[in-house]
Structures are given as structure tokens and as C-alpha cells.
UniProtKB/Swiss-Prot annotation:
GO annotation (BP), single: tRNA wobble position uridine thiolation
Annotated CDD domains: MnmA_TRMU-like
Name the UniProt record assigns to this protein: tRNA-specific 2-thiouridylase MnmA
Chain spans, region Interaction with tRNA: 147-149, 309-310
UniProt family annotation: Belongs to the MnmA/TRMU family.
Organism of derivation: Francisella tularensis subsp. tularensis (strain SCHU S4 / Schu 4)
Cystine connections: 100-197
PANTHER family linked: MITOCHONDRIAL TRNA-SPECIFIC 2-THIOURIDYLASE 1 (PTHR11933:SF5), TRNA 5-METHYLAMINOMETHYL-2-THIOURIDYLATE -METHYLTRANSFERASE (PTHR11933)
Purpose: Catalyzes the 2-thiolation of uridine at the wobble position (U34) of tRNA, leading to the formation of s(2)U34.
């Protein structure tokens, strides 16, 4: 630890603030770096970046560590945002936070850390690393089950994990805020950020329409009968209830409608009635673009648990690895609203094995 240099990604939130503080207390040579990943227009308030930068600076000053800023907006646009738009255009629902970790925080930022002569990178993620018996590094769930973020980190490999520290991975969120308050960090009561970093709290539809032309179309029920109009397939995700604008359909009970399927060829959204309608459930899925934390799948066929969305309870399943590296996943119980473009992430107990993108 003596003089080991750690570069912490400081976002201006409480988690990264406390991460930096703990590392300093543990005797590391710590530098805080704020990553700016998005260029706002003057009229936009997407990310409250100015406030975040000010908070990040204040935290570093308070802890007594150097503060730097780095702009990754070009890398973010090329490697995260353009992919995000392509996916939406294709009718899928991508997860840019996963891609941001892969391309920016643990790639572009890691390269920058090497330039600064850093030994380790640290972030405020709720995750842990553990050395396995065979010498490999495991990605392990954060202690606070409600906050565990391994779902967003499954693309990390051995080389990245060996150079990464997650200082708050073994602490409960409430304790993190307590530590921040005790140490007079300005971020102690700052609200957790929600949503995608470049959209922030703003209305998603309004944001997306700036970049992709929407093509309106019909909404059909499962029998092909027109029951309404949609504003553009990209605005809807499987299982969605809000914003469908279907109501008072003749000869139908007043039961909520849910988006069940996208017919891209005909630009039709298929909707069904009832939260538990059979068309919203599937027992299997296929995933591509697999990342395995250990560098390879545990076996050609294995049982484990999986999540098809963040914060979902682990679901028992069987995974079969195909010749082309894709996987077929069969769940013990049917799963609601499996969404193409989102990720399926695999676990054995508290160890994250990796994951892939649902097709």
C-alpha cells in the first residue's frame, strides 16, 4: 500500500466521495478525477455537470487530494452514444450504463490512469473483487443487496479487475452516507442520480426525438386488431404500461394495456391486457456478445442464476454455450418482459460470471 497510487473516478455523488475518503484513510496516494462524458448544448440541462464538478472539487479539497478533470465526450459519442442510437433505431432497448463502464470508465479512463502513473483505478460502484483459488479475480456482488451494481460491470475482464478497487463494495449505503456526514463531505445528502448520465432526469422521449426521427404507426392487440396509434416503436419497451395511450377500447374490459412485442417490419406495436398476460412471459432467451469475467464460460452447459434486468431477484436457469459463442438460456420459471437489447447477467451465489446482450 505504501505510496501505491490510486486514481478515483469522482462523479460529484456520495458513493465516489466516500470511496476517495476511505482510500486516503487507508494510506494510498489518491487523486480524484472527474470524467465529463457529455457536451451539453447551452439550452440543455441534461447533466447538472457544473454542480457535479463543483461538488467533486469540494470533496477533493476537503479530503486533501489533487483534483483533475478529463473530457471523454468524443470517446463517449463514438463508442457509447452512437451504439445506443443504432440499437434504438433497430427497435431494441440498450443499456448505455453497461457500455459506459466497458468503453469509458474501464477502458478510456484506465488508459488515462496509466498515463498519470496510477497503480489502481477506483470507483464508487457497489461491487467487490475476490481472489479465487486458481489465482483469478472474481467479480462479487456488493454487500448491500439493494445497491449491488455487478449487473452493470459484467463486461470487466481479469486485466481490468486486477487494477480496480471498489472501496465501498463491502459497506451498506446508509453507512456510506453516515461516513460522508461524519467527515463533512458536501455530498452527504445529495440525491442519487437516476437515469442515463446524458439524459439525467429529463424526459426520455423528448431527448430521443432530437436524434432519431420517429415513425408513427398502429398499435394492435394480439389478434391483429387496431386499438390505437404509437409515436414511434423506439419509445416503447417490452412490458411498458405508461404512455401507450390506449383506453376505452370497444368491447374490452377496463384493464391496463402493456407493450408485448414490436413488429419492426410493419411498424406495429403489439399490446396485451393485464400485467400477467401470457404473451409478456418467456421461458428462454438467446444472448450474443458474451463477456466472461474469468475469460471463458464455466462449461459448455451449466446451471446458475441470472438477471434479465437490474435489481431483479436471481432466477435459476440452465445456460448452453453455442459454437459461435452465443448462449441459449432456459429458465426454471417463465420470465416477464425479457427485452431485446438489455443484458442477461449470470451468477453462482454472489459471484458474477459474466453476461451478454439479449436478442
Amino acid at each position: 500500500m505504501e505510496n501505491k497510487k490510486v486514481i478515483v473516478g469522482i462523479s460529484g455523488g456520495v458513493d465516489s466521495s466516500v470511496s476517495a475518503l476511505l482510500l486516503k484513510q487507508q494510506g494510498y496516494d489518491v487523486t480524484g478525477v472527474f470524467m465529463k462524458n457529455w457536451e451539453e448544448d447551452d439550452t440543455d440541462e441534461f447533466c447538472s455537470a457544473e454542480q457535479d464538478i463543483a461538488d467533486a472539487q469540494a470533496v477533493c479539497d476537503s479530503i486533501g487530494i489533487p483534483f483533475k478533470k478529463i473530457n471523454f465526450a468524443a470517446e463517449y459519442w463514438d463508442n457509447v452514444f452512437e451504439h445506443f442510437l443504432i440499437e434504438y433505431k433497430a427497435g431494441r432497448t440498450p443499456n448505455p450504463d453497461i457500455l459506459c463502464n466497458k468503453e469509458i470508465k474501464f477502458k478510456a479512463f484506465l488508459s488515462y490512469v496509466h498515463l498519470l502513473g496510477g497503480d489502481y483505478i477506483a470507483t464508487g460502484h457497489y461491487a467487490q473483487t475476490r481472489l479465487a483459488a486458481d489465482g483469478s479475480v472474481q467479480l462479487v456482488k456488493g454487500l448491500d443487496d439493494n445497491k449491488d451494481q455487478t449487473y452493470f460491470l459484467y463486461t470487466l475482464g481479469q486485466e481490468q479487475l486486477r487494477q480496480t478497487i471498489f472501496p465501498i463494495g463491502n459497506i451498506e449505503k446508509s453507512k456510506v452516507r453516515e461516513i460522508a456526514k461524519e467527515n463533512n463531505l458536501v455530498t452527504f445528502d445529495k440525491k442519487d442520480s437516476t437515469g442515463i448520465c446524458f439524459i439525467g432526469e429529463r424526459k426520455f422521449k423528448e431527448f430521443l426525438s432530437k436524434y432519431l426521427p420517429a415513425q408513427k404507426g398502429e398499435i394492435h392487440d394480439e389478434n391483429g386488431i387496431k386499438i390505437g396509434m404509437h409515436d414511434g416503436l423506439m419509445y416503447y419497451t417490452i412490458g411498458q404500461r405508461q404512455g401507450l395511450g390506449i383506453g376505452g377500447v370497444k368491447d374490452r374490459p377496463e384493464v391496463p394495456w402493456f407493450a408485448a412485442k414490436k413488429d419492426l417490419e410493419n411498424n406495429v406495436l403489439i399490446a396485451v391486457q393485464g400485467h400477467d398476460h401470457p404473451l409478456l412471459f418467456k421461458q428462454s432467451l438467446q444472448a450474443i456478445e458474451l463477456s466472461w469475467v474469468a475469460g471463458m464460460a464455466p462449461a459448455d452447459k451449466f446451471r446458475c442464476a441470472a438477471k434479465v434486468r437490474y435489481r431483479q431477484k436471481d432466477q435459476s436457469c440452465e445456460v448452453e454455450v453455442n459454437q459461435d459463442g452465443s448462449v441459449n438460456v432456459t429458465f426454471d420459471q417463465p420470465q416477464r418482459a425479457i427485452t431485446p437489447g438489455q443484458s442477461v447477467v449470470f451468477y453462482i451465489d454472489d459471484v458474477c460470471l459474466g453476461g451478454g446482450v439479449i436478442i
